[in-house]
Design a protein with these regions (language model features):
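Active-site neighborhoods and metal-handling regions in enzymes and metal-associated proteins
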Residues: 1-271
Length: 271
């Protein structure tokens, strides 16, 4: 496994890419309300990227065995776990949707993040799922420092999630990122402390847990080749940040003016 350690210049470029990715989510946030379609959300995201001078990393993206992805964003509604394709179905009160944005800057750096959105008044269970998934992401992030392991991140997320009656999707994970969309290492959201790759200053990767209200099993929906849903049709939520390992801890880079407030137990976005 070859992990790319980023230089100070690389990290400076990634801060820009990550801020721009977060600002796409800021741009679309006021528009996400009952009646909007995910296709319109996708159009707004593309509009913002054009204004920034970035491009979408997802549109046309085609890893081996997959068809080209058709959207500028991923929009995963309710029981869709990830890779939901934007469509013309209006969102309604009570829906939850994850919007996942990855941009590429003119100089070839990637920034990747996602947020959950609650459409109108949602059920207590839906609100709880989104909030706990947000907290789980941050608990994972807080484990990051030189000398810690990937297993520390996964264990923190898994222990918290399962302790609150949620299940952790295991088939999808966080990933290294830089001048490629997906680099080593893979960041599992479950695991045992003290196991796996030891973290080093300059590593850059995403933490992006997917948690389900029901069981963890998932399946591919239909024949589009992308959309993943919970097998038991239970709600699923995901939050995502890109971060860099610093000399003493971590720095979350996918932050902007509209980023959600930190959980009460988090006092800083870098340490």
């Amino acid at each position: 496994m070859s992990i790319t350690i980023k230089s100070a210049e690389d990290i400076a470029a990634m801060r820009v890419a990550c801020r721009l990715a977060s600002e796409v989510l800021d741009y679309i946030t006021p528009h996400i309300k009952p009646g909007i379609t995910t296709a319109e959300i996708d159009r707004l995201g593309a509009e913002c990227m054009a204004q920034q001078g970035t491009v979408s990393a997802t549109i046309g993206y085609q890893p081996p065995g997959y068809p080209p992805y058709p959207g500028h964003l991923c929009t995963s509604v309710n029981h869709v776990v990830c890779h939901g394709i934007p469509n013309d179905k209006p969102l309604k009160k009570g829906d939850i949707v994850n919007v996942d944005v990855t941009v590429i800057t003119k100089d070839g750096w990637y920034g990747d993040n996602s947020r959950m959105f609650l459409i109108g008044e949602c059920s207590i269970a839906a609100k709880r799922l989104s909030a706990l998934t947000f907290d789980a992401m941050w608990l994972g992030i807080q484990q990051v420092r030189p000398g810690a392991t990937l297993g520390d991140i996964g264990n923190a997320i898994q222990t918290f999630a399962e302790g609150h009656g949620l299940s952790v999707v295991r088939e999808f994970c966080g990933h290294g990122i830089g001048q490629k969309f997906h680099e080593e290492p893979q960041i599992l959201h479950y695991g045992r402390p003290g196991t796996g790759t030891v973290l080093e200053e300059g590593m850059v990767f995403t933490v992006e847990p997917m948690l389900n209200l029901g069981k963890r099993e998932i399946k591919e929906l239909g024949k589009d080749g992308w959309t993943i849903v919970t097998k038991d049709h239970s709600l699923s939520a995901q939050w995502e940040h890109t971060l860099v390992v610093t000399k003493t801890g971590y720095e979350v880079m996918t932050l902007s003016a509209g980023s959600p407030a930190l959980p009460p137990f988090v006092t800083t976005t870098s340490c």
